[in-house]
Swiss-Prot record:
InterPro entries: Ribosomal_uS2 (IPR001865), Ribosomal_uS2_bac/mit/plastid (IPR005706), Ribosomal_uS2_CS (IPR018130), Ribosomal_uS2_flav_dom_sf (IPR023591). The keyword Amino-acid biosynthesis does not apply. It comes from Anoxybacillus flavithermus (strain DSM 21510 / WK1). Keywords: Ribonucleoprotein, Ribosomal protein. GO terms for molecular function: structural constituent of ribosome. This is Small ribosomal subunit protein uS2. GO terms for cellular component: cytosolic small ribosomal subunit. The keyword Magnesium does not apply. Pfam families: Ribosomal_S2.
Amino acid sequence: MSVISMKQLLEAGVHFGHQTRRWNPKMKKYIFTERNGIYIIDLQKTVKKVEEAYNFVKELAADGGKILFVGTKKQAQDSVKEEAERSGMFYVNQRWLGGTLTNFATIQKRIKRLKEIERMAEDGTFDVLPKKEVVKLKKELERLEKFLGGIKEMKELPDALFVIDPRKERIAVAEARKLNIPIIGIVDTNCDPDEIDYVIPANDDAIRAVKLLTSKIADAILEAKQGEEAVVTAE
């Protein structure tokens, strides 16, 4: 049985690509036809590609690998956070901070600062500090949490990236490529598939499409984790 059905993909509008004037010719092999100035993605290929990505993610997670979900466009923010949290992985759903991967040590310092302020809020330090100082710290905490909250437990570089719209997330993609970190991506008709190791040709602008595909990646991780639990129980 396939990981995802044609019916699910159709209902979520995964087949709608971008307007024909906004396309990347490298995506030609994933395009089925053109309708009313819009490219229609070949869903048979999407089914196959979801399967490949699913198996890769499942194997990686079974080996204890960590995946970083990246999606900062409005249509992706909620799904990225929800599905990464559901599968116990990391995420970036606000602005990608340049150097998140290539300058990881600096990012770790910011995370350390975030945890430091969190501790101050919890241990009563805020109660004894001047009000002005507390307001300032709370603002700093809010900002750090917004940008780094999804990676604050990420102690080392991830083993793979799952990216929604590699064109929008080109800095994240470039950093991962520089470090040879494999990339799984939801790639629309206006993107360059050559930069992505596991291409999922799909509509990256519809909330339902993004949610469906992101949830499949999370399912693969959870299936791997359940497999581990089953092995432990059997032992």
